[in-house]
Amino acid sequence: MSKSKCSVGLMSSVVAPAKEPNAVGPKEVELILVKEQNGVQLTSSTLTNPRQSPVEAQDRETWGKKIDFLLSVIGFAVDLANVWRFPYLCYKNGGGAFLVPYLLFMVIAGMPLFYMELALGQFNREGAAGVWKICPILKGVGFTVILISLYVGFFYNVIIAWALHYLFSSFTTELPWIHCNNSWNSPNCSDAHPGDSSGDSSGLNDTFGTTPAAEYFERGVLHLHQSHGIDDLGPPRWQLTACLVLVIVLLYFSLWKGVKTSGKVVWITATMPYVVLTALLLRGVTLPGAIDGIRAYLSVDFYRLCEASVWIDAATQVCFSLGVGFGVLIAFSSYNKFTNNCYRDAIVTTSINSLTSFSSGFVVFSFLGYMAQKHSVPIGDVAKDGPGLIFIIYPEAIATLPLSSAWAVVFFIMLLTLGIDSAMGGMESVITGLIDEFQLLHRHRELFTLFIVLATFLLSLFCVTNGGIYVFTLLDHFAAGTSILFGVLIEAIGVAWFYGVGQFSDDIQQMTGQRPSLYWRLCWKLVSPCFLLFVVVVSIVTFRPPHYGAYIFPDWANALGWVIATSSMAMVPIYAAYKFCSLPGSFREKLAYAIAPEKDRELVDRGEVRQFTLRHWLKV
């Protein structure tokens, strides 16, 4: 913000507002004192009132209560992957030893990136695209994360529909996945648990038969046996379609009025999982074999830390478990009050996220230990990753308990609430990001929200066909893998290097009254970008084509997957080229306008571009 100039008259002092007279909100005032001594006018000036963010003048909706924001962030970050993936990775990678790289990466990269996104959204008061007025040429990364969130919505809502289907099926005296005497069961169905199943198998293709729970999921719910592959999808299943419709209706009426409605919904969806997890833990630890399961979960093998795969798994889990890079944290924090303490919010929410992930392992492995003892197999034979854990192994364990139907209802209500608030966050990222960018959409938020949820519903129909699990697997593998890591990397570089850690720290001090310490500035400037670059490179080097059980995807499906992945990443260079070409002036002038914040426009006009100085790039 530049100081306004005023002519000096013969009066002893002149007060000149630094903003237009009609500007709303706190103003920066330049007080110019003029004295006359021996016929010479002497002037001195001071600034009253600190600089305020220009966005504070905007009439923007805010959260009804601070707790609404915290519950929304926690509800989004704590999702289904925290329940099934973290405990499995911990068991797979040396038990308690896995916590060493996980906590290390959480402290040096996860928390700083989380804090950065909260501060970025809160200061600029806009969605994932609008915040890039701090560096216009990188605005494409905002559209990248918006597109990724949209892609994720195409298949994530299907998981919630599965949970809803299971919930309805649980309101019976006898759960439908207990026996092999149902219409969907095959001759291979066996009540005995297959002890030699492969690590990636869901249970359907085992040599000696499959469990009733596995057949219920793949034959009773998905009807996968009626499809030969991704090129043989078949029609949408009406039961799953009906469940998907209910999910879309829930999402729409949770989002249509903005954070005023979604902030109330999360009081249920974000707290219910903790109530259910506590109940399941109390029940799980009383089961025979539960202690063996928990012991396997916590067993420490520090020699595993010598393996690169353990560190890679920890790094990727940190990136995905916190939810950075989806634009959700930016969108949520943009509705905060300008002076909100986003630093404290970042510490609290990331800590709760990590503790929830760790605690859920006790719930999961108490039941896995019970299942392993019941079927006399090693825990490794029942410990699975992915949907198979929560839709096959866990329902099978619950079916053997007294009052199994009641426990099943409780469990799938938990899955439903875990999924709903995470899906709400993804949709809010898309909606806020676009309505802040296009004022026409802002004036018709309700209609635009309806359009977005209907679009996700129509494309989700491919995932509820007979072969829908193949579409689901393809989207899950490509939509938010390397592309989301790439988006976060560009975001971190844009904030820390182009905009500058110094300026970003000034913004935070302006909001909270406290400047980030050297630790956070070093993480933003050096550690986090290097960490993200490492994870991106590793994700590319270790890439493996997707598969579902024994099914291998054809080449055209893998090519389609890469089109999906690159379409979001391409937003960065495409928008950068568009922005650069649309700016006037010479090459140097174009570059100056492209990388300098919009609020520094007057400085650019005068040729004072701090991004062209070595001091800017070296400053921490």
Swiss-Prot record:
Pfam families named in the record: SNF
Annotated protein name in UniProt: Sodium-dependent dopamine transporter
Effect ascribed to mutating T211 to E/H: Enhances the inhibition on dopamine uptake by zinc ions
A molecular function GO annotation: signaling receptor binding
SS bonds (residue pairs): C180-C189
Site residues by UniProt (Contributes to high-affinity binding to cocaine): F105
Misc. comment: This protein is the target of psychomotor stimulants such as amphetamines or cocaine.
CDD domains: SLC6sbd_DAT1 (cd11514)
Keywords: Cell membrane, Cell projection, Disease variant, Disulfide bond, Dystonia, Glycoprotein, Membrane, Metal-binding, Neurodegeneration, Neurotransmitter transport, Parkinsonism, Sodium, Symport, Transmembrane, Transmembrane helix, Transport
Positions annotated to bind dopamine: D79, S149, G153, F320, S422, A423
GO biological process, one term: adenohypophysis development
Subunit field text: Monomer. Homooligomer; disulfide-linked. Interacts with PRKCABP and TGFB1I1. Interacts (via N-terminus) with SYNGR3 (via N-terminus). Interacts with SLC18A2. Interacts with TOR1A (ATP-bound); TOR1A regulates SLC6A3 subcellular location. Interacts with alpha-synuclein/SNCA. Interacts with SEPTIN4.
GO cellular component, one term: neuronal cell body
Homology family: Belongs to the sodium:neurotransmitter symporter (SNF) (TC 2.A.22) family. SLC6A3 subfamily.
NCBIfam families, A to Z: Na_transp
